[in-house]
From Swiss-Prot:
Pfam families: Ribosomal_L10. It comes from Streptococcus pneumoniae serotype 19F (strain G54). The keyword 4Fe-4S does not apply. One of its GO terms (molecular function) is large ribosomal subunit rRNA binding. Keywords: Ribonucleoprotein, Ribosomal protein, RNA-binding, rRNA-binding. Part of the ribosomal stalk of the 50S ribosomal subunit. The N-terminus interacts with L11 and the large rRNA to form the base of the stalk. The C-terminus forms an elongated spine to which L12 dimers bind in a sequential fashion forming a multimeric L10(L12)X complex. CDD domains: Ribosomal_L10. This is Large ribosomal subunit protein uL10. The gene is rplJ.
Length: 166
C-alpha cells in the first residue's frame, strides 16, 4: 500500500477518534439491507437532529475507538457498520434509530457509547425509551411546581373558608 494511502487512512482514524471523544453519544448500527430510499429518509431524520451518520470501515473504527479510549466498543464492529455521532443530545441518535428500526427491520442496533462509556445494545435501547431533554425538563418543572401549587390551593381554601365564616 502506498504511503499516501496509509497517511490518508491514519488521518481518517484521527478524525473519527476525535469525533468519538467529542460525542455525547455514539450508536453503531448494521444498516445492511436498507433501501436507498430508507437510507435517505434515515439520514434526513438524523441530520434534522444534528446527528452525524457515517458508514466507516470496521478497521478504521477499531483503531479510532482504541485511540479514543473506547477499546471495548471494538467488539461491535463486526459486519457492515454505520455510526451515528451526537455532540449535543445524548438521546437523539438512539431514539431516531430505534424508531426507524421498527419500520425498517433491516436496521439493527449493535451497541454504542454514552458520555464516553461503552454501552450494550440493551442500554442503547433503554436510552431510546427515555424522553428527550425538553421532555425531561418539563417533568422536572412539574415536579418542582407541585408543592407550590398545593400551598397556593391551601391558602385559597383557607381564604374562602374565612370569607364564608365572616
Amino acid at each position: 500500500m502506498s504511503e499516501a494511502i496509509i497517511a490518508k487512512k491514519a488521518e481518517l482514524v484521527d478524525v473519527v477518534a476525535e469525533k468519538m471523544k467529542a460525542a455525547a453519544s455514539i450508536v453503531v448500527v448494521d444498516a445492511r439491507g436498507l433501501t436507498v430510499e430508507q437510507d435517505t429518509v434515515l439520514r434526513r431524520e438524523l441530520r434534522g437532529s444534528e446527528v452525524e451518520y457515517k458508514v466507516i470501515k470496521n478497521s478504521i473504527l477499531r483503531r479510532a475507538a482504541e485511540k479514543a479510549g473506547l477499546e471495548d466498543l471494538a467488539s461491535v464492529f463486526v459486519g457492515p457498520s454505520a455510526v451515528a455521532f451526537s455532540n449535543e443530545d445524548v438521546i437523539a441518535p438512539a431514539k431516531i434509530l430505534n424508531n426507524f428500526s421498527k419500520n425498517a427491520e433491516a436496521l439493527e442496533i449493535k451497541g454504542g457509547a454514552i458520555e464516553g462509556a461503552v454501552a450494550s445494545k440493551e442500554e442503547i435501547l433503554a436510552l431510546a425509551t427515555l424522553p428527550n431533554r425538553e421532555g425531561l425538563l418539563x417533568m422536572l418543572l412539574s415536579v418542582l411546581q407541585a408543592p407550590v401549587r398545593n400551598v397556593a390551593l391551601a391558602v385559597k381554601a383557607v381564604a374562602e373558608s374565612k370569607e364564608d365564616a365572616a
